Amino acid sequence: MVTVRKRNVKVFTFAFVLITVTSFLLNYKHQVTMTTWDPKHIISQFSEQVRKLIKFPRRPCSCSTCISELGHSLWFDQRFNSTMQPFLTSQNALIPEDSYRWWLKLQGEKSPKNINDTLKELFGIIPGDRDPLQERGTFSCRRCAVVGNSGNLRQSQYGQDIDSHDFVLRMNRAPTIGYESDVGSKTTHHFVYPESYKELAENVSMIVIPFKTLDLRWIVTALTTGTINFTYVPVPRKIKVRKEKVLIYNPSFIKYVYENWLQNHGRYPSTGLLSVIFALHVCDEVNVYGFGADSKGHWHHYWENNASAGAFRQTGVHDGDFEFNVTLTLASIEKIKFFKGR
């Protein structure tokens, strides 16, 4: 990783000097004759060319288009806030009071533990800031696949395409064994909350979305004493995951998604939408698979044989239609590419 960065810096420096000198020579050729030789004039012209290049805005990535670039869609510009931090780490482990009070109401937690003490203990166990997704650079072009769990993935044959991405983000149960041709086999990051936890491969980063203080407490004990085994349903006492692979989704970012992108629809965002907006902030190119109904209008998971098994959509917690429209709008303005499946 470091070697690649150094190489990129060298390439950029060489290109910068080459372009500057070439630009100067071409410009100078049109202004003076071969018989004119004024060192002061040459230096002045060269300095002016350098100033022009420095003023040229630096793009946030090396892709043909970068998600975070503004000015293409007013709808997007009014919602996207590049200052929002999707990860909660030891460096920013402070939840603003308004975000904290809003977050506490999501699942009606009673008598929560002190949040500051909880975060201090948590980041004494996990580093929370050593993941490739947390490293950004203007010389990169990060291609991310966000893979949902819709039944429209069945017989889609998207597997190879999904696996070709730099990062593959999945969520909740999301089995891959037996479904590789449709959903792929590669996973780099997996979104979970305590009630949806599944054992992951050793090289997969686990992004925990906390909806209450108890969720953060669960991570602490699941990696140490194993004392918590129940939230509102049974949860594992212990989890098998490397501590450096545990990442925390920022509660303030959940509020940002709810207010900016959902416009306060539903009680709070689904894991699916949280993962899509998360990807907008950490990736340069985002391709979305496995969202929405199948071609027959059924809302179910790709591993379910019962096509009508879509009761999860009627819980009243999430506004599925509004969330899906947000995804479609992002696709229509070419901030993401949306694969509809079958």
From Swiss-Prot:
Topology feature Cytoplasmic, residues: 1-10
Ligand binding (substrate): Q107, N149, N172, Y232, Y268, G272, G292, H301, H318
GO cellular component entries: extracellular region; Golgi cisterna membrane; membrane
Topological relation to the membrane, as annotated: Single-pass type II membrane protein
GO molecular function annotation: beta-galactoside (CMP) alpha-2,3-sialyltransferase activity
Lumenal topological intervals: 29-342
Cysteine pairings via disulfide bonds: C61-C66, C63-C141, C144-C283
Reaction catalyzed: a beta-D-galactosyl-(1->3)-N-acetyl-alpha-D-galactosaminyl derivative + CMP-N-acetyl-beta-neuraminate = an N-acetyl-alpha-neuraminyl-(2->3)-beta-D-galactosyl-(1->3)-N-acetyl-alpha-D-galactosaminyl derivative + CMP + H(+)
Pfam families: Glyco_transf_29
Key word GTP-binding present: no
Enzyme Commission (EC) number: 2.4.3.4
UniProt superkingdom: Eukaryota
Coiled-coil region(s): none
Family stated for the protein in its record: Belongs to the glycosyltransferase 29 family.
Protein name: CMP-N-acetylneuraminate-beta-galactosamide-alpha-2,3-sialyltransferase 1
Provenance organism: Gallus gallus
Lineage, opening ranks: Eukaryota, Metazoa, Chordata, Craniata, Vertebrata
Protein encoded by which gene: ST3GAL1
